């Protein structure tokens, strides 16, 4: 849709084609929703100097013809403001602010619950140079070693099912969080599911769960953008 030069710095694993950050997937889906494409640049946890120009230390970082925007939520607002003729990320709602609660819920509630399940798999996806940093930061946060986490995985999956209850209840009544068409609210949550899909073959929802059908719909959006994305582990049943 636009001839502007967009560059997106995304978290990558040892295989640089595997881009697994949930926050980067929020942005990747938002770009596709707007009909935009960006050159993806692989970035790793220890490559902080490569995004020093953004004056912060995490991804996603979007560069639009010399303008730098970091943080997936700020990027969404930037895209909504600077590409007003493209489809709105707010869907049928009155504005992007309507997605704010879902974005916060995904980051503050869903992500921590899912992290306890996925961190051992994430560790193996990482480039070796990132593993020491990842181990130290995550073990300090969780209060146990990465190797201890699988012992409690079934408990974590049970808790994750409980955490997903509001999402499940909503999707029983409508195909997308925004109603009959997807919005940035859907992408905020879907980013978490892409994180799981890219790094692990663990089934976090059952086939008869309304969330499963919703995830399938999101995977098929934009000519299968997310479904075609390279993954580290993928079972036949997830294809």
Question: What positions do the PLM features span?
Answer:
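GST-like domain detector, emphasizing the conserved glutathione-binding G-site
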Residues: 1-132
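Amphipathic alpha-helical segments that form well-ordered structural scaffolds
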Residues: 26, 30-33, 78, 159-170, ...
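A short, terminal or domain-edge coil/loop segment
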Residues: 58-63, 90-105, 141-154, 227-239
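Short, highly charged low-complexity linear segments
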Residues: 60, 66-70, 132-142, 175, ...
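GST-like fold's C-terminal all-alpha helical module
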Residues: 106-213
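Long, positively charged, glycine-interspersed low-complexity recognition regions
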Residues: 196-239
